């Protein structure tokens, strides 16, 4: 019997990294930090939990810590080089999960420019993988929970709305699915207001699955 599992790729920032599964040099989560983050294995990540729930298999994860969608930062997700790496081993994804943009907010990227680059990213994804389903996640932030860190990045929360509106508009224009996490107005357990801990990863996965259109 043919394998009917969906091949799923992920495009994102530090929230979607894990050592050995995402590009080296841009990793935030990994087993050596599990005692701090509560994220010990890739099975603890939001994206692997979503992939399992969709009865899928990971093809590629091109997520980089500190990366942006727009050209305001380094390694923008709209760049062709990152989009090319959503394929692997001669195979292309059936489904792509995108959760990116918090670093654009943190770096005060101009929302209109962010929206234009998000649209450009989706256009390039369509050109590279015309048969792929794509789900775009809106942005939310976390609350501090069981963390040794005192530095909180939750100030980003107050500036999310225009970026989320840009993501919604870009997904609608491209005809792609939206995981509108922001509309829930709920937060996840985090270490610093942005990076989920183990419990926060479970919450993020639930939020994603609860809000994704037409799964």
What are these regions (language model features)?
Residues 4, 55, 130:
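Residue-level signal for beta-strand positions within conserved beta-sheet cores that form or flank
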Residues 78-215:
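Alpha-helical cap/lid subdomain in secreted, periplasmic
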Residues 15-16:
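Short active-site segment of divalent metal-dependent hydrolases/proteases
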